[in-house]
A protein has these predicted regions:
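Helix-to-loop junction immediately C-terminal to a conserved catalytic motif
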Residues: 28
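Catalytic Walker B motif of ABC-type/P-loop ATPase nucleotide-binding domains
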Residues: 139-142
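Short coil-to-helix segment of the ABC ATPase nucleotide-binding domain corresponding to the Q-loop/switch region
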Residues: 74-82
């Protein structure tokens, strides 16, 4: 069991097959848990009807994926607009919302370009803008830097920190120690169970990354013993 408090930035780590993506899919209402409960904002997501799931997902959750999931036939601006269009938001309000977040994500100068005209790091920042434009209760990120080079990954992770510092709750699955070190807490899972968790506290990223490495070594030792 674990909980995510409002305003937290949590990274989830574990070996391939440990259940990281399954966990994210259950929280995202894409899969249903075979046992237990998942509460988001006081609602048990497993109890939602099919008609309720779509609106809940649209209003309460934001998603950032490894492969960006942007539509090349839409401008970056229109890609960001998409969840607002689905919620029947007026164009003038959409413009205001994009105007608020574009400077924060440093994408103002690429809004009218298309995804194929910008870099991978810029694409991911557009994807983040699309994910947070509705001000979701929870932002879910699945390996958000997996398709990026080191420099672009650093920029994207600093972007996550910026939006988290503004109050956005973030839950991120990653295999990267460097990326996990940007989070305020790291949860380690194996076979669908929480094995360990560590808090960043006042540590800098380098110190926290070393603690994450040490935790992984410890857990791998447990795994080898079990095998």
């Amino acid at each position: 069991n674990f909980s995510v408090e409002k305003g937290e930035f949590i990274a989830v780590m574990g070996e391939s097959g440990s259940g990281k993506t399954t966990l994210l899919n259950i929280i995202a209402t894409l899969d249903k848990a075979t046992e237990g409960s998942v509460f988001i904002g006081g609602k048990d997501v497993n109890s939602l009807s099919n008609s309720e799931v779509a609106s809940f997902r649209r209003e309460k959750l934001g998603f950032v994926f490894q492969d960006f999931n942007l539509l090349d036939s839409f401008s970056n601006r229109d890609n960001i607009y998409l969840p607002l269009v689905l919620s029947d938001i007026k164009p003038v309000v959409m413009n205001e919302k994009v105007g608020e977040i574009a400077p924060i994500l440093k994408i103002s100068d690429i809004l009218d370009k298309y995804p194929y005209q910008v870099s991978g790091g810029q694409k991911q920042r557009v994807a983040i803008a699309r994910a947070i434009i509705t001000k979701p209760d929870l932002l879910l990120a699945d390996e958000p830097t997996g398709a990026l080079d080191s420099k672009s990954a650093d920029i994207v992770m600093k972007t996550f920190c910026d939006i988290n510092n503004s109050g956005q709750t973030v839950l991120m699955v990653t295999h990267s120690v460097k990326c996990a070190a940007f989070a305020k807490r790291v949860i380690f899972i194996k076979d669908g169970r929480v094995y360990h968790e560590i808090y960043k506290g006042s540590d800098d990223n380098l110190t926290f990354a070393e603690k994450i490495n040490q935790a992984q070594i410890m857990l791998n030792g447990v795994n080898n013993y079990e095998k």
